[in-house]
């Protein structure tokens, strides 16, 4: 029972970390606006770039990436700490060491959900791309680096952030399935990639219609 309660607390902390609305706070602090009422209505770094400028967008991007990194680092620390703590408790049928990848998987999903559906913003938010990159880099840096490189190349060619983000998500799925990664990590990347792409439904419709704005243009 203690194990499941501790796990639920850890997931709640990861969700709240992801829910920290960095883009929304940037809009309020810099211009006193609700960024959800401007541009693409998203709180992500791309809309911050279009609405507030380059430097606020860079700060928001870094903060969102660090949210993903922090969630995975926290999950590993919390799990290690709890495993040490539970060593003095009566033995259980659970193999705590083998469950660590699952803890990382669920924590990664929690931070992505928090970023895209923030409890502080009536369950609105960003597209979870930057937070997802942070999760990838902390969980398996080769997968994260590969996804980031594809994003950079696609953005340089197309100048379309949404397209580049979805290609990066698909790349992450391909890499995590092609490389030797634990099953929970594979499931996390597949579920997270599908979630990120699903968050781009409106962008997909605009891409098909040829109306998706390129970087530097107003949404």
From Swiss-Prot:
The EC designation for this entry is: 2.3.1.275
Pathway membership, UniProt: Lipid metabolism; phospholipid metabolism
- Could you tell me which cysteines form disulfide bridges? none
Predominant cellular place of this UniProt entry's protein = membrane
Gene Ontology molecular function: acyl-phosphate glycerol-3-phosphate acyltransferase activity
InterPro entries named among the record's database cross-references: G3P_acylTferase_PlsY
Q: Does the keyword Acetylation apply?
A: no
Q: Please provide the record's keywords in A-Z order.
A: Cell inner membrane, Cell membrane, Lipid biosynthesis, Lipid metabolism, Membrane, Phospholipid biosynthesis, Phospholipid metabolism, Transferase, Transmembrane, Transmembrane helix
One GO CC annotation, please?
A: plasma membrane
GO BP term (any one):
phospholipid biosynthetic process
Question: What membrane topology is annotated for this entry?
Answer: Multi-pass membrane protein
What task does this protein carry out?
Answer: Catalyzes the transfer of an acyl group from acyl-phosphate (acyl-PO(4)) to glycerol-3-phosphate (G3P) to form lysophosphatidic acid (LPA). This enzyme utilizes acyl-phosphate as fatty acyl donor, but not acyl-CoA or acyl-ACP.
Extract the NCBIfam families matched here.
Answer: glycerol-3-phosphate 1-O-acyltransferase PlsY
The similarity comment for this entry is: Belongs to the PlsY family.
What is the designated name of this protein?
Glycerol-3-phosphate acyltransferase 2
What organism is this sequence from?
Rhizobium johnstonii (strain DSM 114642 / LMG 32736 / 3841) (Rhizobium leguminosarum bv. viciae)
Show the taxonomic lineage: Bacteria, Pseudomonadati, Pseudomonadota, Alphaproteobacteria, Hyphomicrobiales
């Amino acid at each position: 029972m203690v194990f499941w309660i501790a796990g639920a607390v850890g997931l709640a902390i990861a969700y709240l970390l992801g829910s920290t609305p960095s883009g929304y706070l940037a809009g309020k602090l810099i211009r006193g606006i609700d960024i959800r009422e401007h541009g693409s209505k998203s709180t992500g770094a791309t809309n911050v770039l279009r609405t507030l400028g380059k430097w606020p967008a860079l700060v928001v991007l870094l903060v969102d990436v660090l949210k993903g990194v922090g969630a995975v680092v926290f999950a590993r620390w919390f799990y290690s700490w709890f495993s040490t703590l539970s060593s003095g408790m009566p033995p259980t049928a659970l193999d705590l060491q083998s469950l660590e990848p699952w803890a990382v998987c669920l924590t990664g999903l929690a931070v992505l959900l928090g970023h895209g559906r923030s409890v502080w913003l009536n369950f609105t938010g960003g597209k979870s791309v930057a937070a997802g990159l942070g999760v990838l880099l902390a969980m398996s840096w080769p997968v994260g680096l590969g996804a980031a490189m594809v994003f950079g190349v696609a953005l340089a060619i197309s100048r379309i952030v949404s397209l580049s983000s979805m290609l990066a998500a698909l790349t992450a799925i391909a890499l995590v399935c092609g490389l030797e990664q634990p099953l929970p990590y594979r499931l996390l990347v597949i579920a997270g990639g599908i979630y990120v792409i699903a968050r781009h439904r409106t962008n997909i419709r605009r891409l098909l219609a040829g109306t998706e704005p390129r970087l530097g243009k107003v949404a």
